[in-house]
């Protein structure tokens, strides 16, 4: 499957981290920003109002994590939590995401950078 077909956007001209998460959710029978009719489905910060809010103590694999990015309040990054690692006094999250160095990859993020953690919504007809 071509990336633009899966995402529904042109990854050359679109910041596509949110489109990737929406595609993963839809392929896994979860509601996405697209399927719930969110007004801004292609923005990472659109996920700030999605699903169930989760604390850092409750986080589990598959939860959605939103991070800040850039200087504008609408900018952000979104990915899926895989696991955490503690190094000294710091906690890091392994995040699976799209548009991380222009590709789908797993990247380590400091827990202090987290804006929100959300639990996905399972579609009712699965």
What would you call each of these model-derived segments?
Residues 1-61, 71:
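Catalytic cysteine-centered active-site loop
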């Amino acid at each position: 499957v071509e990336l633009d077909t899966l995402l529904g956007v042109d990854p050359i001209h679109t910041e596509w981290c949110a489109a990737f998460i929406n595609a993963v959710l839809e392929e896994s029978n979860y509601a996405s920003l697209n399927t719930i009719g969110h007004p801004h489905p292609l923005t990472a910060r659109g996920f700030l109002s999605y699903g169930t809010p989760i604390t850092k103590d409750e986080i589990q694999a598959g939860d959605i994590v939103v991070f800040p990015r850039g200087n504008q309040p609408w900018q952000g990054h979104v990915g899926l939590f895989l696991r955490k690692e503690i190094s000294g006094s710091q906690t890091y999250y392994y995040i699976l995401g799209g548009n991380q160095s222009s590709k789908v990859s797993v990247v380590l993020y400091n827990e202090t950078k987290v804006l929100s953690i959300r639990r996905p919504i399972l579609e009712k007809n699965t």
